[in-house]
Amino acid sequence: KDGMAYRLVPAVLSSPQQNWIVEQAFRQNGLGGTQIRANNLDSMYKTMMNDFEFGGAGKKGVYYDEENRRHILAIRSLYGEAAGNMADAGRKDEAQKLIDKVEAGINPANLPYGLVSRYNSHNQTSMVYLEACYKAEKKEIAEKVRTALRKDLNQQFDYYAALGGMSRAEFDNLFNTY
């Protein structure tokens, strides 16, 4: 991947997704894994830091409909993927710069880290971003993302529990048995 586009060229592939805990967790829970793949880190970093602009996504008070949220979420995910792979390659300074740029470029008040969405894809994407923040040692941002995700997931659980079915204890026990 070069920046935000795939390029078809002969290459020796590595498997950076093996370094991601979220990739393994999604696969174990039948979610099919993530989109994390081998990247041309130098080209991706150059494109994201020098060429890409967020087009006003950092402005306060902007509303995004579901389709626009999906697109902006993909951008946040790509920055997270690049930052996590950079950190795995020992390039934490560059990873931190990527996280800083996306944080400045996408206002979390307009596009929260945790949010109900189709197939819960918003929260899945945020989990990739959360892991990238930890890998890049951006612990303050990681804590904000973790708190928002946990709050949203708990609210979703409470909603579904109110409909009947499993109690919180039964649900927690389900995950503790694995």
Model regions: which residues?
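ER/secretory pathway lumenal C-terminal domains and tails of membrane proteins involved
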Residues: 1-178
